[in-house]
């Protein structure tokens, strides 16, 4: 093949994929398989000792999943990646090599409610502590870091409020403390935002959302830039010190820029078992082939709908970084020049009850707890996705009682506006009685 650098639209179709060597099939096959035959005993030993690359068992690596891993790593500009069963599993997998009981990580207050709940409660069972900080207060971010801090975590475009994190500023603070910056790029996708170019060291995805794009497959992904020095500080012994699971092998010394990726496959997936199913990887590969086309339409529709909502008398605010009036508009141009994605929130002047009435009155929008679908989705976070949070946490996450979250799809934008118009009228009519 000609030695050249391909564009994003080409890579989203071709990266990682090759014609099947056995059949010549051009589309990546679904290897619905668990185990793989060894050539001989020496081959088996080499695989188990991590001396040779290959397939052992699909909990660690599967041929279909491997194509997806290479494609997402390529699109993000990373050195390597490993897939997980869900986005929540990806968050566990990103932190697992870095943390020990008693360690902490600093996370943005502007996160998906499920992440806040996972960090606050489930991670306590591992002995991990989270410290939530508003990343707009950089002094507070610095102050939250101590000798037991092991990572800094944020979302590129926050769900649900559409807030855009100043990634360069967060990376500078993290690196000054000898810590990696982990960025959840689910809402933005690698088409809209390039976290590695702004200082991120690891990227997480819920591939369930825009990467798959059609709400057909659960999945997650952790992508490693491959440049963080895991041996420099002594803070990451799982990567820098001898591994008892592999007869004293040191992952960073042995695998260099792929240390985190190899650890993720050989230890995290092996022992926690959060692997992605081949069928789900196949569905996600199909979705990624049209990622740029879909995201352009998603963003155009979102801007049109948000602009209309901004002028509606029943609406108190619209939080969408793509609007010129947004306080994050300049940041959107810096980090997401092709568009600010299609997840945003707006507030209803009539509060919580009006929000409930609105989601029950829509006809074209689907009322459900997902995002990144080709279909337009609506939800009232305070009564659903962010219900477990305290009122204070809801407010910090831009998910207060009056807030509605939209995930704008690829339908005709005028049809979406018409549906919101009739639903808003229905919610106001009841309020006026």
Which residues does each PLM region occupy?
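PLP-dependent enzyme catalytic core of the Aspartate aminotransferase-like
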Residues: 120-121, 129, 147, 294, ...
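N-terminal "arm"/small-domain region of PLP-dependent enzymes with the aminotransferase-like
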Residues: 2-62, 70-71
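Conserved N-terminal alpha-helix of the aminotransferase class I/II PLP-enzyme fold
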Residues: 40-92, 114-122
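Conserved small-domain helix->loop->beta segment predominantly found in fold-type I
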Residues: 272-275, 280-281, 286, 290, ...
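Glycine-centered tight turns that cap/initiate beta-strands
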Residues: 77, 148, 314-317, 364, ...
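Conserved PLP-enzyme active-site core in the AAT-like
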Residues: 2, 12-14, 18-21, 81-311
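Structural preference for beta-strand elements that scaffold enzyme active sites
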Residues: 151, 180, 202, 317, ...
């Amino acid at each position: 093949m000609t030695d050249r650098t391909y564009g994003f639209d080409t890579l989203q179709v071709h990266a990682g994929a090759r014609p099947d060597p056995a059949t010549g099939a051009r589309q990546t096959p679904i290897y619905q398989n668990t185990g793989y035959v060894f050539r001989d005993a020496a081959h088996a030993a080499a695989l188990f000792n991590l001396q040779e690359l290959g397939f052992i068992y699909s909990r660690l690596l599967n041929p279909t999943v491997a194509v997806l891993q290479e494609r997402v790593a390529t699109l993000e500009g990373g050195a390597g990646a490993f897939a997980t069963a869900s986005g929540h599993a990806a968050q566990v997998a990103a932190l697992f090599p870095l943390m020990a009981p008693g360690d902490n990580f600093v996370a943005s207050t502007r996160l998906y409610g499920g992440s806040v709940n996972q960090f606050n409660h489930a991670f306590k069972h591992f002995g991990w502590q989270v410290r939530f900080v508003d990343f707009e207060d950089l002094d507070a971010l610095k102050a939250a870091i101590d000798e037991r801090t092991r990572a800094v975590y944020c979302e590129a475009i926050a769900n649900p409020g559409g807030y855009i994190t100043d990634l360069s500023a967060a990376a500078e603070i993290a690196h000054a403390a000898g810590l990696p910056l982990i960025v959840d790029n689910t809402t933005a996708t690698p088409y809209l935002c390039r976290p590695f170019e702004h200082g991120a060291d690891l990227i997480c995805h819920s591939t369930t959302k825009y990467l798959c794009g059609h709400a057909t497959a659960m999945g997650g992904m952790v992508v490693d830039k491959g440049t963080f020095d895991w041996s420099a500080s002594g803070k990451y012994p799982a990567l820098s010190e001898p591994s008892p699971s592999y007869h004293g092998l040191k992952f960073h010394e042995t695998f260099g820029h792929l240390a985190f990726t190899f650890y993720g496959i050989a230890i995290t997936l092996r022992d926690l078992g959060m692997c992605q199913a081949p069928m789900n990887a196949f569905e996600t590969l199909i979705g990624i082939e049209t990622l740029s086309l879909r995201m352009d339409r998603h963003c155009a529709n979102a801007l049109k709908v948000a602009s209309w909502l901004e002028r509606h008398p029943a609406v108190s605010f619209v939080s969408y970084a793509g609007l010129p009036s947004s306080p994050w508009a300049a940041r959107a141009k810096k980090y997401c020049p092709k568009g600010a994605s299609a997840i945003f929130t707006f507030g209803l002047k009539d509060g919580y009850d009006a929000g409930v009435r609105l989601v029950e009155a829509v006809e074209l929008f689907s009322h459900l707890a997902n995002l990144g679908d080709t279909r337009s989705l609506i939800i009232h976070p305070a009564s659903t996705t962010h219900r477990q949070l305290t009122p204070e946490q809801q407010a910090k996450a831009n998910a207060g009682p009056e807030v509605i979250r939209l995930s704008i799809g690829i339908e005709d934008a005028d049809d979406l506006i018409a549906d919101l118009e009739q639903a808003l009228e229905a919610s106001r009519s009841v309020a006026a009685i």
